[in-house]
Amino acid sequence: MARHDHQLHEGESLKTAARDRLTQQGEQWTEMRASVFDALASFDKPASAYDIAEAVSKAQGRRVAANSVYRILDLFVGANLARRVESANAYVANAHPDCLHDCIFLICDQCGQTVHIDDDSLSGGVRRAAKSAGFSAPRPVIEVRGTCGDCEKD
């Protein structure tokens, strides 16, 4: 795995890093965006827009539409605050929003746990293979399905 320095955030540190990243890109950190980010970060597995809309609705005591959440999630993905797990049509908060790396997800088929790893040599190999096939893949997404260590023990 390629070595690189980046700060992993969680809790308030993650929320602060996300807010700072978004505002540095000229976007506003609104109450709704903060609520969506809080809900997204609270999930320990990838969450769909519907899951997030339900969590925000409960927290705010009013219905929040999933299409509003989708728009915010698209903004978050573009700003590197969230990653989309393509095969699950779900999202995870990016624990290091100031670092740009390709998405490599390890997804447990049994419990749904999803781990994001960085391996620049692996994603670089995918990019090179794509290029040799005449295909451009500037930011490949790699999803590996299998069984996590906890489920493997069971």
Model-derived segments and spans:
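Short amphipathic alpha-helical elements of helix-turn-helix/winged-helix folds
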Residues: 21, 38-43, 55
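Non-DNA-binding regulatory cores of transcription-related proteins
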Residues: 77-154
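DNA-recognition alpha helix
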Residues: 48-62
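Short alpha-helical segments that sit at the start of domains
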Residues: 4-37
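Short capping segments at the starts of secondary-structure elements
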Residues: 29-31, 43-48
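Basic amphipathic alpha-helical segments that dock to polyanions
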Residues: 69-79
